[in-house]
């Protein structure tokens, strides 16, 4: 029948399109019960048949495997007949609803028979033959896919259990992974009920004895996390799935789950309201004590929850919780008048900085004097940052190097640092070079090579040049020049420029540190000194196009422009330019 089922990366075959995941898991569980085990050919034929059967949905809603068996063609390849037969054998037969008894009075209709709810059945997990599941931690996309599948089903319902079983079979989760999955899928009430039921089942299993369980090695939850204890992990997973049997079977939380303790309500009266609501709302046979304990803590106000957390009684018996919160009383929340402290009066002595009375020295508006003379010019009246010798003389290059508009001195003095004694930040000078049509943008720079002194030269600022160009007279005599082709406005040129592959240092007037270039172009004819974009990019320069007002030309008479010999234009009445036109 083909080779046996191997162990691929994903041991679960993908469900056919249009079939719910929990229904597809039923077919997989039936296939894993075949002896000998199924092959890849059997799964391929099963998916192929289900794709055809979905187009005839007479066996769906509700699913009927007997009708599905009648749709299988005769002599169909694979073991589809055996898989469907196992499903028919393990699925309990649905009894027909009993007919309503006849009423004695013909005027009164007979009572409507209530349908009994089907008990959810959790079967043990069966893994593929020869393909044991490997543990994989949850990812957010996996949790979102599981939550989307069970969003329309209640916790503990058959669809919910089948989807969770498929997730457990695929990922082989540990005890911590199962706890995270429960917190992500269910509400706090359902998680609390499931936790209490799981603790009861674990205590019973530890008492009866489990194969491979050692009481001296810790609880079952700790031993199930051991990767070598695969049997204990499967037992814990089955107990975790069985704990859903005690949950309510409706999709939404009941009305008694929304009962909250008021901010000023005593804890005893809140528990009494919960007790009455559970007596009236719980169905018969549902244990009330675990639900009452869970709601007594989860729906209590913040003050009572803090008291229970501090004493470690979040899951204690109800009597201990009542004794812990019986002394709690709501706090007095009456409004009171807040009296602010009086402001410290100013000192009687004069300020040691300005000599005036009425303020502290930290609030003095006079700048803080320097501690000593300036280390540059030895002037004791200013700080080193304000020394005039450190400022660049911009009188000769006002058209080339412009300063940003700065604030007035009196405005800058008000912007002192907090508790800084009048310290003010120095002025920020940024290079702004205007590009105008009347005057070429030029800069006085200094160029130096390795082990050579800097040489002053006037360079043209060209934002269209990629590489800086230097004349051949500045090039060292022992330089190794390489031929190159330069594409300019006049076309390509091969004999005018050459490349100098050595470091070049360019000193700009507005930078203390020189700009270092790895290579530059050398003009053999000694005509051009161009500062290109490779140098401007290192100094973070920006283009500044100066705004120039447009020229206003006077209106000239015909005599001034030589048109006095032409006849005057004819006067033709036009609409709406004639005088008789309507102005409405």
Swiss-Prot record:
EC main group: hydrolase
EC id: 3.4.23.-
Residue numbers spanned by region Disordered: 95-116
Position of sequence motif PPXY motif: 109-112
Position of sequence motif PTAP/PSAP motif: 98-101
Keyword Transferase: no
Keywords: Aspartyl protease, Capsid protein, Eukaryotic host gene expression shutoff by virus, Eukaryotic host translation shutoff by virus, Host gene expression shutoff by virus, Host-virus interaction, Hydrolase, Lipoprotein, Metal-binding, Myristate, Protease, Repeat, Viral nucleoprotein, Virion, Zinc, Zinc-finger
Keyword Hydrolase (UniProt): yes
A biological process term (GO) from this entry: viral translational frameshifting
Stretches annotated zinc finger (CCHC-type): 349-366, 372-389
Site (Cleavage): 123-124, 337-338, 430-431, 553-554, 561-562
SUPFAM superfamilies in UniProt: Acid proteases, Retroviral matrix proteins, Retrovirus capsid dimerization domain-like, Retrovirus capsid protein, N-terminal core domain, Retrovirus zinc finger-like domains
GO cellular component, one term: viral nucleocapsid
Domains (record comment): Late-budding domains (L domains) are short sequence motifs essential for viral particle release. They can occur individually or in close proximity within structural proteins. They interacts with sorting cellular proteins of the multivesicular body (MVB) pathway. Most of these proteins are class E vacuolar protein sorting factors belonging to ESCRT-I, ESCRT-II or ESCRT-III complexes. The capsid protein N-terminus seems to be involved in Gag-Gag interactions.
Complex formation: Interacts with human TSG101. This interaction is essential for budding and release of viral particles.
Function field: Matrix protein p19 targets Gag, Gag-Pro and Gag-Pro-Pol polyproteins to the plasma membrane via a multipartite membrane binding signal, that includes its myristoylated N-terminus. Also mediates nuclear localization of the preintegration complex. Capsid protein p24 forms the conical core of the virus that encapsulates the genomic RNA-nucleocapsid complex.
Protein name in UniProt: Gag-Pro polyprotein
């Amino acid at each position: 029948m083909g080779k046996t089922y191997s162990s691929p990366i994903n041991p679960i075959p993908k469900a056919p399109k249009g079939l719910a995941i929990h229904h597809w898991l039923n077919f997989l569980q039936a296939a894993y019960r075949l002896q000998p085990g199924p092959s890849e050919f059997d799964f391929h034929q099963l998916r192929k048949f289900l794709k055809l059967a979905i187009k005839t949905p007479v066996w769906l809603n509700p699913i009927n495997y007997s009708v599905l068996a009648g749709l299988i063609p005769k002599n169909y390849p694979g073991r589809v007949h055996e898989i469907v037969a196992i499903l028919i054998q393990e699925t309990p037969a649905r009894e027909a609803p009993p007919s309503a008894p006849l009423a004695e009075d013909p005027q009164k209709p007979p009572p409507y028979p209530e349908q009994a709810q089907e008990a959810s059945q959790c079967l043990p997990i069966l893994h593929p033959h020869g393909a044991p599941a490997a543990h994989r931690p949850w990812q957010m996309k996996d949790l979102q896919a599981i939550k989307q599948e069970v969003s329309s089903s209640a916790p503990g319902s058959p669809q919910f259990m089948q989807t969770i079983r498929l997730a457990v079979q695929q990922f082989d989760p540990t005890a911590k992974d199962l706890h995270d999955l429960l917190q992500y899928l269910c509400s706090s009430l359902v998680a609390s009920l499931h936790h209490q039921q799981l603790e009861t089942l674990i205590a019973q299993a530890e008492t009866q004895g489990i194969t491979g369980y050692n009481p001296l090695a810790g609880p079952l939850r700790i031993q199930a996390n051991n990767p070598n204890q695969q049997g204990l992990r499967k037992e814990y997973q089955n107990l975790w799935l069985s704990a859903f049997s005690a949950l309510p079977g409706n999709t939404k939380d009941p009305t008694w789950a929304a009962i909250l303790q008021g901010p000023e309500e005593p804890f005893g009266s809140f528990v009494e309201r919960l007790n009455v609501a559970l007596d009236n709302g719980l169905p018969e046979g549902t244990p009330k004590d675990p639900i009452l304990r869970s709601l007594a803590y989860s729906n209590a106000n913040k003050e009572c929850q803090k008291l229970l957390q501090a004493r470690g009684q979040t899951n204690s018996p109800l009597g201990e919780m009542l004794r812990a919160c019986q002394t709690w009383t709501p706090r007095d929340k009456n409004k009171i008048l807040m009296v602010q402290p009086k402001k410290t009066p100013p000192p009687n002595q004069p300020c040691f900085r300005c000599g005036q009375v009425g303020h502290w020295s930290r609030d003095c508006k006079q700048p803080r004097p320097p501690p000593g003379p300036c280390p540059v010019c030895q002037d004791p009246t200013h700080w080193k940052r304000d020394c005039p010798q450190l400022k660049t003389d911009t009188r000769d290059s006002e058209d080339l190097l412009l300063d940003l508009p700065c604030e007035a001195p009196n405005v800058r003095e008000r912007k002192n640092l907090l508790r800084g004694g009048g310290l003010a930040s120095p002025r920020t000078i940024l290079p702004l070079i205007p590009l105008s049509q009347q005057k070429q943008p030029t800069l006085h720079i200094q160029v130096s090579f390795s082990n050579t002194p800097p040489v002053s030269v006037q360079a043209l600022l060209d934002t269209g040049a990629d590489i800086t160009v230097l004349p051949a007279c500045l090039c060292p005599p022992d330089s190794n020049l390489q031929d190159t082709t330069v594409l300019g406005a006049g076309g390509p040129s091969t004999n005018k420029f050459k490349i100098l592959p050595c470091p070049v240092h360019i000193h700009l007037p507005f930078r203390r540190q020189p700009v270092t270039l790895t290579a530059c172009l050398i003009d053999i004819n000694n005509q051009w000194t161009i500062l290109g974009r490779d140098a401007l990019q290192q100094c973070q320069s920006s283009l500044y196009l100066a705004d120039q007002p447009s020229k206003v030309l006077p209106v000239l008479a015909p005599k001034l422009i030589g048109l006095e010999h032409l006849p005057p234009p004819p006067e033709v009445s036009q609409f709406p330019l004639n005088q008789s036109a309507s102005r409405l």
